[in-house]
């Protein structure tokens, strides 16, 4: 296997320091050499990490920034040598890299037109996917371009029920199984803490001294960054309505000039909203997973919908959130 050296200066923290909410944990820097895995092997590793709640970003068969961070974080959490080498047993956890998905009649009901203007969107009851490609890519945590690459020659505008598609063999984000409503507290996770690293673009959850999961995020922007400090989750909702207020989004000032946008995968906050005790700030999903970790947001902590759907089952209302 051909090797290249990709020196990754990734801040993996001291677990003990991470358990303390009063200080920003000091970084540990690990220079990591990663093998140049072929596309299928990289995909298998992405699937393994994703299924283990160490999100590598969108699955695309490439060794990108979040693939590296997820791999080192997983090794850190499981007391493994922090190198880029991968033991064969990791790959053995994903014996089948790809699977098939058959387009269903009900899938087509999840697709529709979404007007570009927020005033028009506010008149709707649901903001659906705008294409079957987006539906399938999000279901399998993948880049749209990768799904297209795996299915050459497919006419995505005219796919019919019964057609079969090749997709990564990852645990799917089954959008139809999520019902609008509040997320209850989970006493079992009352001691867990959420750390939002605005420099590495990561959300990490700790249970006492144990790293539980890591997901890539977009944490605010230069003009309206995620608020540094210690906060708490006040409440959480699945398929939330979103109060679109440009004053709040751009300047952090609530106004009466707003639109209530209905829920759906094309809602700006996606499948989940977890509100913090900081007005207008929350942890939420997105209508554009392709941009996670790269494009800016409006002060909030944004995840891909497939990661947001999982984070609600890994934390609890009332948990401490430390943004640094």
Q: What are the residue ranges of the model-derived segments?
A:
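Extracellular LysM carbohydrate-binding repeats and other cell-envelope/extracellular binding modules
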Residues: 65-110, 146-182
């Amino acid at each position: 296997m051909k090797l290249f050296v990709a020196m990754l200066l990734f801040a993996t923290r001291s677990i003990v320091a991470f358990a303390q909410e009063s200080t920003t944990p000091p970084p540990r820097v690990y220079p990591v050499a990663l093998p140049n895995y072929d596309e299928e092997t990289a995909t298998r590793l992405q699937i393994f990490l994703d299924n283990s709640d160490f999100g590598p970003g969108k699955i695309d068969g490439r060794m990108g920034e979040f693939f590296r961070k997820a791999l080192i974080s997983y090794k850190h959490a499981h007391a493994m040598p922090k190198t880029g080498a991968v033991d064969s047993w990791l790959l053995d956890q994903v014996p089948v890299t790809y699977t098939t998905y058959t387009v269903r009649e009900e899938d087509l009901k999840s697709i529709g037109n979404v007007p570009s203007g927020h005033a028009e969107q506010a008149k709707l009851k649901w903001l659906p996917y705008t294409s079957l490609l987006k539906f399938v890519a999000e279901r399998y945590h993948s880049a749209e371009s990768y799904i297209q690459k795996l299915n050459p020659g497919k006419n995505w505008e005219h796919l019919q029920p019964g057609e079969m598609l090749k997709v990564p063999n990852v645990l799917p984000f089954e959008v139809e199984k999520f019902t609008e409503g509040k997320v209850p507290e989970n006493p079992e996770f009352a001691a867990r803490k959420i750390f939002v690293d605005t420099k590495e673009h990561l959300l990490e959850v700790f249970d006492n001294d144990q790293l539980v999961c890591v997901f890539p995020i977009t944490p605010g922007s230069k003009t309206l960054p995620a608020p540094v400090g210690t906060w708490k989750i006040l409440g959480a909702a699945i398929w939330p309505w979103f109060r679109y207020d440009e004053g709040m989004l751009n300047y952090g000032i609530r106004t009466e000039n707003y639109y209530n946008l209905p829920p759906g995968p094309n809602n700006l906050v996606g499948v989940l909203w977890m509100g913090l005790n900081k007005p207008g700030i929350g942890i939420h999903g997105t209508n554009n997973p392709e941009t996670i970790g790269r494009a800016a947001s409006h002060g909030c902590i944004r995840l891909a919908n497939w990661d947001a759907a999982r984070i609600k089952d890994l934390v609890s209302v009332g948990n401490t959130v430390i943004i640094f």
